[in-house]
């Protein structure tokens, strides 16, 4: 018989996998994995804002991550720095500022390891509600913008020429990334949330023949990562968040055999 805390963790993990699957595919297609890292690092500033102002942590993380995302999009247009330099600048600067602020708040106790790596086994009913309702909103918005977003991924200039306003949908997509980071911070932490986005999508890309297959397999990969990771953490007493990411890595490694078979068939 599973304990209540484990069932809650499963419900949260399943909800996350359903959302990170489609989002992760778009991240992989658009080569935005480091962009996700930047938003995740900036989330630490949102955490400190939550502690200092006593507002909801998910809300403060969402606000800060969204601001950083929009600043980054603006800087990409107005500076000559390459995107990877801007990403590194904002990622490490925001992380450093967040850690400095934590150091200055000597009267407030922080679970820094929990913030960085998460603790999905400590979630409560409110977290389940947040993940499922927040995730549903993210998926609805993603469904609405999916066609122009996908078109701009394939050919940005053509999408712009057809009046699809790709920059507008890029901004909306980055805000969706900020939203999934905000609702997932307690579960897998700041440093591992990008793994939930990238690993299932990367695995799915290896075994898929078209974009829709990739989305479906990415969701399945995320669900398997959650199930394998959580049960493994329960059996061998390992941290739950890192165990989920490790399970995703193992699935990715297994998917490489499909690439090898494709290569052999082509030869």
Residue ranges and their predicted role:
Residues 1-18, 267:
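Membrane-interfacial amphipathic/re-entrant helices at transmembrane-helix boundaries
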Residues 7-8, 77-79, 87-147:
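Transmembrane helix-bundle core of multi-pass membrane transporters
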Residues 9-12, 57-65, 84, 88, ...:
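Loop-to-transmembrane alpha-helix initiation sites
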Residues 12-20, 42, 46, 50, ...:
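Alpha-helical transmembrane segments in multi-pass membrane proteins
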Residues 25-108, 204-216, 233-235, 259-261:
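Short loop segments and helix-boundary regions at transmembrane helix junctions
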Residues 140-173:
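Membrane-helix/interface signature in polytopic inner-membrane proteins
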Residues 193-242:
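Transmembrane alpha-helical segments in multi-pass inner-membrane proteins
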Residues 241-245, 249-267:
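Cytosolic-side transmembrane-helix boundaries in multi-pass membrane proteins
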């Amino acid at each position: 018989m599973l304990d209540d805390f484990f069932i809650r963790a499963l419900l949260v993990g399943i909800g996350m996998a359903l959302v990170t699957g489609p989002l992760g595919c778009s991240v992989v297609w658009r080569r935005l994995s480091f962009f996700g890292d930047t938003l995740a690092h900036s989330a630490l500033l949102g955490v400190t804002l939550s502690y200092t102002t006593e507002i909801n942590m998910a809300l403060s993380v969402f606000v800060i991550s969204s601001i950083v995302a929009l600043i980054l999009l603006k800087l990409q247009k107005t500076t000559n720095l390459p995107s990877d330099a801007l990403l590194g600048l904002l990622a490490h600067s925001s992380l450093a500022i967040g850690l400095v602020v934590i150091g200055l708040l000597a009267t407030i106790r922080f679970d820094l390891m929990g913030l960085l790596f998460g603790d999905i086994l400590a979630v409560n009913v409110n977290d389940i509600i947040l993940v499922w309702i927040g995730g549903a909103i993210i998926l609805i918005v993603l469904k609405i913008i999916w066609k122009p977003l996908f078109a701009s991924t394939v050919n940005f200039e053509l999408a712009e020429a057809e009046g699809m306003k790709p920059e507008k949908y890029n901004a909306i997509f980055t805000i969706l990334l900020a939203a999934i980071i905000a609702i997932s911070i307690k579960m897998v932490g700041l440093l591992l949330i990008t793994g939930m986005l990238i690993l299932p999508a990367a695995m799915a890309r290896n075994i898929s023949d078209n974009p829709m297959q990739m989305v479906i397999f990415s969701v399945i990969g995320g669900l398997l990562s959650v199930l394998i990771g959580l049960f493994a953490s329960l059996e061998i007493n390992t941290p739950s968040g890192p165990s989920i990411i490790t399970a995703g890595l193992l699935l990715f490694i297994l998917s490489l055999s499909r690439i090898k078979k494709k290569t052999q068939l082509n030869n």
